[in-house]
Amino acid sequence: MDASGVDRRYGVIEIGPGIGVLTRELAKRAAKVVSIEVDERLPPLLAETMAGVDNFKLVLQDVLKVDLKALIAQEFPGMPVAVCANLPYYITSPIVMKLLGDRLPIESLTVMVQKEAADRLAAAPGTRASSAISCAVSYYATSKMMFTAAPGSFYPAPKVTSAVVRMEIRPTPAVQVEDCLLYTSPSPRDISGS
């Protein structure tokens, strides 16, 4: 929670609230929380956890299909905005790239992901852990691994170690390029792993 840097000035977009344990804590700190959840089974549990919380709204939709610029303009006028997310490994890159590549008016993106994905998100260009996603993240933001969480920190315990990465969005990209999609897209070598 502290890793997000959120306080009462902030509007927060939360991706993947689950049953709302983190959501409730975010709502205590932020001016408003809008959570985006794709799993249609979770709203009843989330409603129970968030009962009595008036600065919370749920959007039941796939985050990759949400018009986030419109959502931010409608829900957070005049507020700084932070994104907090607990992302499954298989969808980490598409979501991070949507959030960064769409140049949304957000100040930061704080994600909990599988440790291996966190290593790549936070890797400095040219290091052993760097990859196409590392390059893209460093183009749009500065990133820092905040902490790791052992499987026993959760119930039920996953089979992997997780980590939190905070990305602070750059006001302008790190370098000027004519085609940022070409610059931030993986090369054939990155895709094949050779």
Which residue stretches match the model-derived regions?
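Single conserved hydrophobic/aromatic residue that forms the stacking wall/gate
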Residues: 183-194
